Structure formats: structure tokens, C-alpha cells
Amino acid sequence: MSKPVVSTPLCSILHELRTAENSGSYFQPKLRSLKAANPKLKLLDVGSGWGHMGCSLAQALGPAGRVVGVDISPESISHAREVAGRCGLEDRVDFVQGDAYKLPFADNEFDVAHAHQVLAHLERPWDVIAEMVRVTKPGGFVAIREGDLESEIVYPAEPGLLKFHKLIATAMTARGKGGGGADTGRKLLPWALKAGAKRDQITVSYGTWWFDTPEHKDKWAKAMTGQVRDGMVGEIAKKTGLATEEDLEEMATAWEEWAAREDSSLAMMHGEILVEK
């Protein structure tokens, strides 16, 4: 990846909410089928970040399975290994540094290759899908899930939140340079086809994220305010003049007020694909 997407403590706030159960239900039936035939499954988690999803996937595979997470950031790899240790999974999960555009693995090495909320950040996501297919064994599958920010609904739709939505969508699209962006979830099928997969190999589905409990709203709001005050969104806004300091503070305050409300909620669609090999 030419410009690494580095997980931060603010990113980790949301990563901790992601599990194989709530973010991987679309591939669980196929995973169970493979596991019944071979308990010693090997799964690759591409863009593994701080390791929370990889550890959850290891628990889903069971004691005989193994997960390898790959990420461009050495800081993320170090933290992911700490997470695996805290979960008691260091013998079943490993994390290695590598480039998603050129995965450091042999052809046909994994039963499953998985990515979650990764392609939205990349300029050539179809090339990453092709790499994931390459390292997957015949009879295995690739599983990818990506958010579609353009489908987001939020209540109440306060002006500061609407400004934020427009800004982050613009920032993501600019960063993707014609690849990933704010509408990534709906593009997984054409990208898989561009990667060389045949249509009858691909299964498409859609899922939903929603945040309505105080705990989950607080985590979401902290991550979004972090993006505005210290993260990618604020950085791009300042460099390009898309928003002033006053605009950014209005957005951050709007998220804090949204999280504190009893009647607030948010939902977003996610695209999901399985590519069978």
C-alpha cells in the first residue's frame, strides 16, 4: 500500500465492537461447513489492524484452527499481538507485517481469506481482492465486508452531523483516488469481477450496523470526534480548505451531543461478498 492506513487508539474504539458474530454472519454457514470437513482451517485476516477481529475469528475456528493477520503498520502488528496474548490466543493467532497489494504468502495457502473495512481506504481494491483469491486454496473462499457511508442514516440529523457526513465522504473519496471511498459497500461485486472472479463464484449480500445503546453511541461518537480533531478527516479538511476550525469543532460537538441524547440512533448498510475458489 503506497499510503498505509494505520490503526490508532481511536480506530480501536470501533474495532473492539467488531466480532465474527456481528460482522461475519454472512460467511458463518460456509465456514461451519468447511470446519466440519477440516477442523484445522487456516484463515487470513487482511488489514488486521489492532487484532480484535482476528482474535474473534480464531475463537470461531476453534482450538484446531489458525488465524494469520497481515497489516502494513508495525505499530498495529505489535498491538495485535498484545491483544492475542490478553485473549490467551497467542498459539492460535499470529500477526505479520505485509502489503495487501503483494501478500507475503504462497498461492493456495489459506482456506479462507477475510477483510473487513479495509478496501474503502485503498486506491486499487480490486488488486487486493485478486491477491486474496490467489492465496486461497481451491474449495475455500474469500469473504469481504465494507461499509457504505452514503447509506448512513442518523437521528436527529443536526446540521453539524450533516456537515460531518459530507466532509468524511469527500475525504474518503479523495483518499481513494478512484478506488475506495464513501460508497465502497455497493462496489464489491464489480471489483471482484474486475479482479478476475467469475459471476457464478460470487455471492452478494448486505448487512447493517446500528448504534442505539449509550455504550455503542459513546464509542462511535468518540471515534468520529477523534477523526475530526486529530485524525484523517480533520487533517484533509485543513489541508484542502474543506472546513474551518470552527466547522470542525461544530461537528465534534454535534457528535458528543448526539451520543448524550436518549432518543438518538444511527444505522449504515454494509456490502458483503463471498468469492468461492
Q: Which residue ranges define each predicted feature?
A:
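A short acidic, Gly/Pro-enriched loop at the edge of an enzyme's catalytic core
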Residues: 101-112
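A short SAM/SAH-binding and catalytic strip from SAM-dependent methyltransferases
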Residues: 111-125
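Class I SAM-dependent methyltransferase Rossmann-like catalytic core
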Residues: 1-21
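C-terminal helical/coil "lid" or tail adjacent to the Rossmann-like core of SAM-dependent
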Residues: 2-6, 163-167, 201-266
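Class I SAM-dependent methyltransferase SAM/SAH-binding core
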Residues: 41-102, 127
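Conserved alpha-helix/loop element of class I SAM-dependent methyltransferases that forms part
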Residues: 16-40, 56
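A short glycine-rich, Lys/Arg-flanked "PGG" loop and its adjoining helix->strand segment in the class I
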Residues: 126-141
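Conserved catalytic/acceptor-binding region of the Class I
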Residues: 143-222, 226
